[in-house]
Amino acid sequence: MVGGGSAQKLTTNDALAYLKAVKDKFQDQRGKYDEFLEVMKNFKSQRVDTAGVITRVKELFKGHQELILGFNTFLPKGFEITLQPEDGQPPLKKRVEFEEAISFVNKIKTRFQGDDRVYKSFLDILNMYRRDSKSITEVYQEVAILFRDHSDLLVEFTHFLPDTSATASIPSVKTSVRERGVSLADKKDRIITPHPDHDYGTEHIDQDRERPIKKENKEHMRGTNKENEHRDARDFEPHSKKEQFLNKKQKLHIRGDDPAEISNQSKLSGAVPSSSTYDEKGAMKSYSQDLAIVDRVKEKLNASEYQEFLRCLNLFSKEIISRPELQSLVGNLIGVYPDLMDSFIEFLVQCEKNEGLLSGILTKSKSTYLLQGEGKYPQPSLDNDRDQEHKRDDGLRDRDHEKERLEKAAANLKWAKPISELDLSNCEQCTPSYRLLPKNYPISIASQKTEIGKLVLNDHWVSVTSGSEDYSFSHMRKNQYEESLFKCEDDRFELDMLLESVNSTTKHVEELLTKINSNELKTNSPIRVEDHLTALNLRCIERLYGDHGLDVMDVLKKNVSLALPVILTRLKQKQEEWARCRSDFDKVWAEIYAKNYYKSLDHRSFYFKQQDSKKLSMKALLAEIKEITEKKREDDSLLAFAAGNRLSISPDLEFDYPDHDLHEDLYQLIKYSCAEMCSTEQLDKVMKIWTTFVEQIFGVPSRPQGAEDQEDVVKSMNQNVKSGSSSAGESEGSPHNYASVADSRRSKSSRKANEHSQLGQTSNSERDGAAGRTSDALCETAQHEKMLKNVVTSDEKPESKQAVSIERAHDSTALAVDGLLDQSNGGSSIVHMTGHCNNNLKPVTCGTELELKMNDGNGPKLEVGNKKLLTNGIAVEITSDQEMAGTSKVEREEGELSPNGDFEEDNFAVYAKTDFETFSKANDSTGNNISGDRSREGEPSCLETRAENDAEGDENAARSSEDSRNEYENGDVSGTESGGGEDPEDDLDNNNKGESEGEAECMADAHDAEENGSALPVSARFLLHVKPLVKYVPSAIALHDKDKDSLKNSQVFYGNDSFYVLFRLHRILYERILSAKVNSSSPEGKWRTSNTKNPTDSYARFMTALYNLLDGTSDNAKFEDDCRAIIGTQSYILFTLDKLIHKFIKHLQVVVADEMDNKLLQLYFYEKSRRPETIFDAVYYDNTRVLLPDENIYRIECRLSTPAKLSIQLMCNGLDKPDVTSVSIDPTFAAYLHNDFLSIQPNAREDRRIYLNRNKRKVCREDEQLYSTDEVKIKNGLECKIACGSSKVSYVLETEDLLVRVKKRRKTLCHNQDSWVRQMRLQYYKNNFL
């Protein structure tokens, strides 16, 4: 069929465009599109001529002029389709307005005021239609019954119906309104439900009026009977889901629930045909039988039971209850009638086969029951029933014959289609993929099926197609290497099949030729080759001769004895030729397999290379842990609230490190790559971070350094000291160099002393602008405060220390030491002691030096007169000598913060007892002895630490011991090594005996009191110097024995985003190297290496290939091939190792150069230098928060177990966020605070009296501090707030100071005369001389 009707030549695109237009037009009616395709296939196969195609297309596209005219383009000349104007088409309905619908409902309500049943029934019908429980046909039918005597309402109701063919098929105006309504329902029921005039057993409404309509339908049916038969036989298709045999011309769904579909169908077909089809005849017969069962049930049951029966059927039709449940419910009603129950079960079987049957019966039964219940209409007479029964039987008999004939004609048409085009959706289902073929479907008989095949092979269950032509199954994408292997396999298979076929044919031809030569076969009768050679043998012979195969087969069949020898020679010739070709191709195929096998197995490397760079980016790694943290944030907040907002440890990421030896390989890789990428100076810094920080986190033993490495370290540290930028991460990072670096700093303390004196005399504005100088001043005053507390507590034993609570936190959180380690150009370092972040100033001592805790407490030191102000606001008198001594001490400890000495003992002792601690009296030992004991107590810990650090060799141990001797000779010993190494008696004889200004104040004795001229009582004067002896650490963060043991086996580090990415990259590198090591030693890897000529260690070969890639000896392609050969299919993650290592080293360089990262390293080494019993995780965390107030903080912990476990947690600051660190304080407010508010004026002067020396010695021989606090319990918990603007002081609620003195028992008077005389003398002395 050539498109001659068009001026220009048609192309394939024109045909595709037309098909797309047809498909779009009938997207909701897929059957029409499929039928159009079937018409085109029939024309292509010459089953239908051009005229037949035109006829079918006109029928299919009726109502769509654009499609019909567009089809003319593809018709030859002389076959154009001409359209005639269609007469009698009803005009389009006017759109119904909402106000009209409201008016119509109100009219119904007004009309039936006296009968609310009609109005409620009308609303129920509409609601059921809205819920898709009723079709539009059922709605019209029931409304017509309700408005039986109100024709005007029924006519008006038809205007609200969808624009379907039902409304278009209403008869002329001459017919009465009642006849029009009944005719409409009659015609619609032919499509969806049985005709209402066949409602046997129920009342027939106005049968006389229906007779003209039936007659008209009957005449029309006779006129179109032949045409329908022809079309039904030709166009029959089994795609209808509701009935097996449906008229092709109607193309309507059996239920027709959707008004839109009915409207669309009416537009396509013009109008619903008024005649019934032959399929309806069989349906009517079945319908009458099923309805008779319902009538029988109605006769047996009363009204209520029958209503219950209909309700059960309704529930079953809506699939609310199952069939067994329905049988159980109905059995309770009609179970006493066995024959009726059996008929009902058969009725259910028929309902399952025809889904529209039950709904139609329910509609008829409900309508009839409704009318009969009202009693308005009389029952039909028995004579009318008999007449209707005879007429019905005659009509059904004719229809049965017609249906049988139609089925026979359709069987030859529809079952000729392939199974893939059948609609098996209603057939029995075995699995989601298999359906049972219909019983009347002709099954092809397999010719070569054996007995076993008949038992096991399937002929009735077919696999249904899933999807459509728009959705094809997506196979796995093959790479180019697989394509090469597949091509080889195809060629090899083809050649194998040829060889096997030739060998088999040769064998059978030889056997047949032998039989002929030995006269085993009778030569009188012709020999049938098919009896001795199989179909495959004959096909091989035919293929052997190519185009002349058919001629050879004819010769073979005519003269077997002459043709067989020639054919056998040809077969053997081809057999040798193909065998030789096979051996040659085996070598080619083997080479192709060797080159492409491992590459063909690699399906992931291509995508892995594209995504790996994104996954290794800092943004992706941060997003990963943030996503995990956000999921846990809600639960963690609830836990934190329940625990008093304490620190919650719940790792977000956890990793195992099973192979400890792998750290050595990582070290060698990093060192080798750094030599290729970094300069000498960068190499030293990067490797120092690696060895002293990264490896120590994972518990890798320290690496010994050679002489060259030590010289490099000393040079680099000297350069750092000269430039004034000392880093704790570099000075304390390596345990071996800790003492030597400290000595190099101590040697420069005298030269730096003057610089720090000048820093102490600068103005406030200079301090505000210079953070480094401020840090030095704070470090100096912190050390003075430390020495002051050491002297105050000189008479107490370590096991009976006095505990004073310096702070009462509202949320029971831990006390902390916030260390602001500011490594700036000035090389300063700050250590500030503070508690829980709070907005309150807290008095922590009583007496002349009232210490106030501020929420940030990191402000600079100010000078007011001759007093130096610490950040917490304490004024301390400092002499010039003491100032020099203190300055030199700060210089010695600059950049080297080691809290192992008395500083930690006195300020971080943990007390898990009650709030009140009893101050026990010390023995007769003086403060000097206590101080000496403490110095001896502090030395072993330092020696042990130094011995552990220098245990690598005798040379380092000798050097450290020599350094310690130099320290003692120079008299420059800090609290790190000795809390009071010098004798306190020597301090009284020398001007420079005090190591801090606090020491000078607290060594005052009776002679100092006389020189100062103070006349206070002894006890009052002692109380002026009572200070908190130790910082109180709540039991919430106190380490128990179990925690201490776990702390020894773990390393905790708090870092920022940079360190988190560092450890993640380390983990990824470790994981990939471990994968290479594990997979190379797997059984598959051993099998690969055993096949090689020189089997070696697979892992060593891999490392060699990796080093060759890093130094440029080999390229990436060579490295990938080596990895595939050594490791196998899991090697794809190793293809980007060079990029990962380079990224890792660049990140290490960033960490080394970043100032904040160095501060975090310095803080880590500072916390690590504590003794285990004085380490608190919360303290370390709070110190980190001071450094990173607005940044993410990560808790990185490595448990040195087997295997080692690394856990990473993104900490959530929550409500306890530290305030911004203060940098200055108003001088006016500071002067008021210390000169007025904190100043103490003695109430009365102490009278000068004469004391006997023996009495004076008796009182003064004991420690003055213990004398004033004898049997006293003290708790300092009172807190106050001072507004800097108004200087207003307010006390914090629920805080208090307590001082409790336990009463002594009164001594009973001794009856001994001597004791009585002694007491009398003592009383006389007190009355007259005291």
Swiss-Prot record:
Any single GO BP term: response to abscisic acid
PAH domain sequence ranges: 8-78, 94-164, 283-351
Residues with PTM Phosphoserine: S996
Keyword Protein biosynthesis (UniProt): no
Composition bias type Acidic residues, residue spans: 980-989
UniProt-listed InterPro entries: HDAC_interact_dom, PAH, PAH_sf, Sin3-like, Sin3_C
UniProt-listed Gene3D superfamilies: Paired amphipathic helix
Chief localisation class: nucleus
Ranges of Low complexity composition bias in the record: 723-734
Complex and partners: Interacts with ERF7 and the histone deacetylase HDA19.
Free-text function comment from the UniProt entry: Acts as a transcriptional repressor. Interacts with ERF7 to repress genes in abscisic acid and drought stress responses. The heterodimer represses transcription by tethering SNL3 to DNA.
Official protein name in the record: Paired amphipathic helix protein Sin3-like 3
Recorded name of the encoding gene: SNL3
